[in-house]
Regions:
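Intracellular loop-helix junctions on the cytosolic face of multi-pass helical membrane proteins
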Residues: 1-47, 129, 135-146, 154, ...
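Hydrophobic core of transmembrane alpha-helices in multi-pass small-molecule transporters
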Residues: 57, 130-132, 136-159, 356-383, ...
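Loop-to-transmembrane helix entry/capping segments in MFS-fold secondary transporters
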Residues: 82-83, 172-185, 299-300, 364, ...
């Protein structure tokens, strides 16, 4: 047989050069798909599905709709002052503060033989009832409204604790995939938030805040579905007799782990870092939507601004996954903390209207502010999540991870209530917020000094 004719060398090189761009484009699509397949193969598809539902749909999409809907519900339906709305926001976040309780229950109290599945079902059912009640009653008393909003928050918190326990458990059995699992959580949350904020303003405008609460029954129903589908071995009946002993053992294990310097120091850092940054987001929201001195953003625009801000969170998750996950832990926290302090000063620039002096329209500056703040916040959050997942003792993953996350939430609650106190003491209504920002300048400068002196 004769030899097949060979192409000239320069023709082969040209063909390879022409194929390289195609391979580059295909790799951009195939790489994430391969990553998802790898996670599904190593960790089971139901786990990946559960993470995407809880973080992407329940917390991301649902959380975005709930945030915008609740802010307009308090402002337009309940007609409360900014300082009151700030305090009420802290009350509805209490289920996130007591996350260790949910974690302890999922670890030591199986329901119908399951540690995780039953709690997913309960969380989904609770969310459906709470959102249905809010959507159907037009003139709810503020106490009942807070009760249902807190129940809805508890629904999301319980699902979050349960899926975090699954993540921590898998991080113990697959330590090499710990960062990948946190990236999956972060990407799901960021994409869900992006979609949720994009449509939140439109839905609030079209169907009102209570209509949005009705839509939130869908994410809660999907969480219930996760409880049906997630893979988990059934607990033997003998374990029910050991619940009291399990409580004691879990408490001892948590306390023993917390006393380690490598554990309590990051915990202290997390609390101080969040609590020192006073939060007046409700006052800023009222000012941005109502005050004549402010930009008077519409409902749709508020949703779009938050959506674009979520792009920053998504970019932060991608940047961590593909560039910073192997970066030294302390260095990453140090620089993200400094950048976080600087980003916190951007609100001051907006309220003082300095952006207009530089020719930056309000909408453009707010978008930049939201994107930068979300990106830095995600970079600051990711290494803490990875560390928290890795130091969880085996057998009490849900309890300990929930405890670590509740420390963060306690810091956020402290910042929120201190911010509400600031709004109340200085009578910072929407029209007075602008004129009283001198105090806010001094507060931010002091916070920056405190965090710079923090021993990382």
């Amino acid at each position: 047989m004769g030899e097949e004719p060979r192409l000239p060398k320069h023709n082969e090189e040209e063909m390879q050069e022409n194929e390289q761009p195609k391979k580059g484009i295909l790799s951009c699509v195939s790489s994430p798909v391969s990553w998802f397949k790898m996670l599904a193969k190593e960790l089971h598809w139901s786990f990946v599905f559960g993470v995407m539902v809880v973080y992407g749909i329940s917390q991301g999409l649902g959380g975005s709709l709930a945030r915008v809907g609740t802010e307009y519900y308090m402002k337009d339906v309940q007609k409360v002052l900014p300082s009151e709305a700030q305090v009420y926001s802290g009350i509805t976040s209490i289920p996130w503060i007591i996350k260790p309780l949910w974690g302890l229950l999922t670890d030591v109290v199986p329901i119908l033989g399951y540690h995780r599945r039953s709690y997913f079902v309960f969380a989904g059912f609770l969310g459906v009832i709470a959102m249905l009640s809010l959507s159907l009653h037009n003139e709810l008393h503020i106490v009942l409204a807070l009760l249902f909003l807190t129940a809805g928050s508890a629904s999301v918190a319980i699902a979050d604790v349960t899926v975090d326990a699954c993540v921590a458990q898998n991080s113990g059995t697959h330590p090499s995939l710990a960062a990948d699992m946190q990236s999956l959580c972060a990407l799901s949350s960021s994409i869900g938030s992006l979609v949720g904020f994009s449509i939140s303003g439109i839905f609030v405008h079209l169907i009102g805040p209570q209509g949005v609460f009705g839509l939130l029954m869908i994410p809660a129903g999907l969480v219930l579905l996760v409880g049906v589908l997630v893979k988990e071995p059934r607990t033997s009946f003998v374990e029910y007799k050991q619940i009291n002993q399990n409580f004691v053992n879990a408490s001892k294990a948590v306390w023993k782990t917390l006393k380690l310097p490598d554990v309590w120091r990051p915990c202290l850092y997390m609390y101080v870092s969040f609590s020192l940054s006073l939060n007046i987001s409700e006052g800023m929201f009222y000012w941005a939507t109502d005050s004549k001195a402010g930009p008077s953003f519409s409902k749709e625009l508020i949703g779009y601004i938050m959506a674009i801000g979520s792009i920053g969170s998504l970019l932060g998750a991608l940047l961590y996954q593909y560039g910073l996950k192997d970066y030294p832990f302390r260095d990453l926290l140090f620089w993200s903390q400094i950048l976080s302090c600087l980003a916190g000063m951007l609100d001051l620039v907006l309220v003082r209207r300095w952006n207009l002096k530089f020719g930056l329209p309000d909408i453009l500056f707010v978008v930049i502010d939201a994107s930068v703040s979300q990106l830095i916040g995600r970079l600051k959050w990711m290494p803490l999540l990875v560390l928290s997942a890795k130091i969880c003792p085996p057998g009490i993953e849900g309890t300990f991870f929930a405890l670590l996350m509740s420390i963060d939430n306690a810091g956020l609650l402290t910042a929120s209530w201190l911010g509400g106190l600031l709004l109340h003491v200085f009578n910072l209504t929407p029209t007075l917020l602008y004129s009283q920002m001198r105090f806010w300048i001094r507060t931010r400068i002091q916070v920056f000094k405190n965090l710079m002196m923090l021993n990382l």
